Regions:
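Conserved AMP-binding/adenylate-forming core of the ANL superfamily
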Residues: 3, 7, 24-69, 73, ...
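Conserved AMP-binding A3 loop
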Residues: 36-38, 171-212
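Structural core segment of the AMP-binding/adenylate-forming
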Residues: 53-54, 84-156, 165, 496
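Adenylate-forming
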Residues: 67, 112-121, 141, 236, ...
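AMP-binding/adenylate-forming catalytic core of the ANL superfamily
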Residues: 93, 99, 110-113, 393, ...
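Conserved pre-ATP/AMP-binding loop-to-beta segment of ANL
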Residues: 157-177, 181-182, 221-231
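Conserved AMP-binding/adenylation subdomain of ANL enzymes
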Residues: 195-235, 239-283
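Conserved AMP-binding/adenylate-forming
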Residues: 255, 313-439, 444-448, 461-462
Length: 550
């Protein structure tokens, strides 16, 4: 991957250049609500003015506890304007968890929807968020809690903050949702994040990465002039890096970010927005999003009113792969569609890309192509494993990356090691890389199953199981076994009753027999986090409880 770190600027400065160049273009759409770049910049500037008046500035942490909404992006932009660091907080967290993130980050500002007000009030009453001194509540029909101010009143009363000189070393703090341990704050300097997002933005569009602010604005103007400005629909929550980062990538190219208006995923609303705003790209996370989307497309087609998806050029799935049947179903309704599976992490990437072009037959979704700066490392020695080796190693990528984890130098040293003078990001996924760059993803080392001394990576079992036509979703875990230490157990949901042996046979047809599940636990729905990622702790608990009762 080419060096994309030459532009050493704040994201606020970049977005201001875009706003000046195209003030009347659409910046944000949520449901039927529209906001131009002029409005977006003005509202963010007024909130930044309120921040400045409250003593919020460089390095201050500004936490967001919100559903997808314009206020989310406004508060991120406003924080950037005053050189503060946005902090994402999972809106499903309970009071103690909200307090943990705010306290761990040292957040001084919390912007939140009224729907979360009771939990915020509980955390405050219990003295769990001592650093938070400014509460801004977004009005959604709930009463204002003690000590908070209405978000929109603050903006209406504030004067726009003047534009200032900023630094590419300003930071965004992204908390990982992970499936093990407490959330960790990943520190992303602005210039490093710009470099990392060059791949899904400029490079994916075949464009040179700008190296000056004028070039950023000029590139956006050229894209708009050609009629190809990106219109990015972010289906996952902005509280996760997948949606937020791709929204930022679309913004810096002068594009429009489209968000669903509802608070639960509605596939029909998504397709309405695609048609209404001529959406060009959709960001999602695996089959958890794709299955209701394809079901909605099929229902419309069967009713005699198929969707017009001529504008849709790309669907990108990060964090979970799309199954072959879902790729086929999407491609059947969108003639110009390119489908991308990307291996990424809060700590960086991409580590691999799987592209299904228009007319291609979808293949095994666990096979990707690694960019040149991606290697595998021996987990014990940290030596680079030559491409073409069958030895599994930890995926690692060099190039733009975070500064580390907030307040955790030991984990920073483990995840971002320097090897032979090169700094790598090593989030913990195991894989092999063939001579031609083909990546076979094996899964995360922390959830690797050890059965009789054999290492079994869940993802290869899950991908194989989903090839059974009646399997909707599946997650593989290891359950304790007296003789083998662990045995592979599959927790899965199906469209109809299925003989467990049929699923096991499907797996054995695709991978080594010893990797196949010894038992299967059927559930109505395989639980996934709001970002679409599988929850291995939930699956392990579910499997153990079901097997104990059988």
């Amino acid at each position: 991957m080419s060096d994309t770190g030459a532009l050493h600027e704040s994201w606020a400065t970049l977005w201001e250049a875009i706003a000046d160049a195209q003030p009347d273009a659409l910046a944000v759409v949520i449901g039927t609500q529209e906001m131009t770049w002029r409005e977006y910049d003005d509202r963010a500037a007024r909130l930044a003015g309120a921040f400045t008046a409250a003593g919020v500035g460089r390095g201050t942490k500004v936490a967001q506890l919100m559903f997808n909404c314009p206020e989310y992006m406004e508060s991120v932009y406003a924080a950037f304007k005053v050189q503060a660091s946005p902090v994402n907080v999972n809106y499903r967290y309970q009071a103690a968890e909200i307090a943990y993130v705010c306290d761990n980050a040292g957040a001084e500002v919390l912007v939140f929807h009224g729907a979360h007000a009771d939990r915020v009030a509980t955390a405050r009453a219990d003295g769990l968020m001592p650093s938070v001194r400014l509460l801004l509540q977004v009005d959604d029909g709930h009463s204002l809690i003690d000590g908070a101010r209405w978000y929109h009143d603050v903006i209406a009363e504030a004067e726009p903050a003047p534009r200032i000189d900023r630094s590419g070393d300003d930071e965004l703090l992204l908390y990982t949702g992970g499936t093990t341990g407490m959330p960790k704050g990943v520190i992303w300097p602005h210039h490093e994040l710009f470099g990392a997002l060059a791949f899904p933005g400029y490079m994916a569009a075949g464009l040179d990465v700008p190296t000056t602010i004028d070039a950023v604005a000029g590139t956006a103007a050229a894209i708009r002039g050609s009629g190809h400005s990106p219109v990015m629909l972010c289906a996952p929550p902005l509280m996760h890096g997948t949606a937020l980062f791709l929204a930022m990538s679309a913004f810096v190219m002068g594009g429009t970010v489209v968000l669903l208006g509802g608070r639960s995923f509605d596939a029909d609303e998504l397709w309405d927005l695609v048609e209404r705003y001529q959406v060009t790209q959709i960001s999602l996370v695996g089959d958890a999003f794709a299955r209701p989307m394809t079901a909605a497309l099929a229902a419309r087609a069967e009713a005699g009113s198929p969707r017009n998806l001529a504008s849709l050029q790309r669907i990108a799935s990060t964090g979970a792969t799309l199954s072959a049947d879902q790729k086929r179903a999407l491609a059947a309704h969108a003639p110009n569609l390119m489908i991308l599976d990307m291996i990424g992490a809060s700590e960086g990437g991409p580590f691999g890309v799987s592209a299904t072009m228009p007319g291609d037959e979808p293949t095994d979704t666990a096979v990707f192509t690694a960019p040149p700066n991606v290697v595998t490392l021996d987990p014990d020695t940290h030596e680079v494993i030559p491409r073409g080796s069958d030895t599994p190693g930890m995926l690692a990528v060099s190039g733009p990356m975070p500064a580390g984890y907030l307040g955790d130098p030991d984990k920073t040293a483990r995840t971002f090691p320097v090897i032979d003078g090169v700094r790598y990001t090593v989030p913990g996924d195991f894989a092999t890389i063939a001579t031609d760059g083909t990546v076979t993803l094996l899964g995360r080392g922390s959830v690797c199953i050890n059965s009789g001394g054999e290492k079994i990576y869940p993802e290869e079992v899950e991908v194989a199981a989903r090839e059974h036509p009646d399997v909707i979703d599946a997650i593989a875990v290891g359950v304790p076994h007296e003789r083998f230490g662990q045995t592979v157990t599959l927790v899965c949901s199906t469209r109809a009753p299925v003989d467990p042996d049929a699923i096991i046979d499907t797996v054995k047809e695709r991978i080594a027999h010893y990797k196949a599940p010894r038992q299967i636990v059927f559930v109505d729905e395989v639980y996934r986090a709001p970002n679409g990622k599988l929850d291995y702790r939930w699956a392990t608990d579910t499997a153990i409880a079901a097997l104990a009762g059988s």
